Structure formats: C-alpha cells, structure tokens
C-alpha cells in the first residue's frame, strides 16, 4: 500500500470493462471496421462455456439460424440483442451484411458507444501493460496530464523539470483512447502506441471511420493518485478482516486498486 501511495495506481480499465464474456471490445472493433455481421454474431450468438440459462439458449438458437427462437429466448433485460433480433426478424432476410448493418443502426446510441469505447479501453490497457515498469515515469515526447483529474494534455519538452513533477505526483504520462481527434505523443511513447495498434491489425489511418464520431478519442492518465487512504484492522475472533477506504479521480475504477493490492 505504501508503494501504491507513493507511485500511484496503474489506471487499468480491467476485466469489468469488457463484460462477463470479455468480448465487448471485439464487438467494438468489428463495429469500427463496419464488419456488422461479425458484431451482431458476437452480441447475439457464439455460445460459449460462460453462457448459461436463457442466454445460452438464445445464443445457441442464433448460431443455428433460428432468429425468432433466439429473440424469444433472450431475457427482457438484454435490450441490445433483442433490438438487433427484432430488426433482423422484421427484415426477413436472415443474417447478411446488409441486414446486419440495418440492425446495428437500430441500436441505442448508448449501446453503440459502450461497445466502441470498450475497444478503445482494451488498447489503452495494452499500452499501459507494455509500459507498466515505467508507468510513473515521464518520457520525452509524452503528452502529460496534471493530477488528479486534468483532461488537457501538454507535450513534455523539459524532461528534467517534468520528471521532477512526476516524481512529486503532480503530473503523469497519458495513454491513448485511439480515435481521429486524439492528440498523439512523440518519440518513444508514440512508437509504443503505434506498436499496439499494429499488433491489433490497425494503423493510424484506420481511425477515420464514420463510427469514430461516437468515440473520437482522448488522452487518459496512465496512473492515478490514491487519495485519503485509510486502512483499519477489523479482525474479530479467528477471522482476519481489513477495512480499506480511499478516493479516486472521477472515472477511475476501485477494482484496479484491488487488483494491484492482490498481486503476489
């Protein structure tokens, strides 16, 4: 805990960002490439070991091509798959690229944005994972953010001065939410981000698709401060209990802190 307090916490989105099947980022990537059949199949079908009950029944029916049975099986709370299937059934053409495109266009904008941002979040986490040994450092050409919650990044030019501010917890390097309006760093940071794009089959010029208008890109902090930390021993009897409380900047996940604490 002392190390996290001193260095800050790696600002991973973590598993909860990608759904219980861990594939919302794959949906987002398919949507951004306008591979709508693939996106619809990921949302409505491709039954796997994690699927149970009515959701498994619905996905199995979809995979078998029975769109009506799939629609009937989805729980009412699963609005996205139901909306897609209603559109496909109404069109009456089965699953084709054309019918999938119409179905995707029927999705609620919030659902669409959720999938697109999941794709961006996955790549952000991959950049942070590559930089994890140096996540609290500043590199020449970095786009840095003031802590705890600034959104406007600035280019690191005076490395000595900015590294001192980073060591004091005043600023942090930023990472990418890739998109056409995302400011790009220079030097070593830029090369790392381009390598992550390439590893996922993307190039910088692929980030101009029409659907990026829903998630145009931004910079986020690679680390976040652990504020107002309080640890209390609440052990009673033979049961060891520790109460942990802390504050994080808006938009950051407490699960990221817990994941770091539980590392061996």
List where the protein language model places each region:
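Extended, charged/glycine-rich binding lobes that contact polyanionic ligands
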Residues: 1-237, 241-245, 249, 259-264
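Pseudouridine synthase
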Residues: 252-256
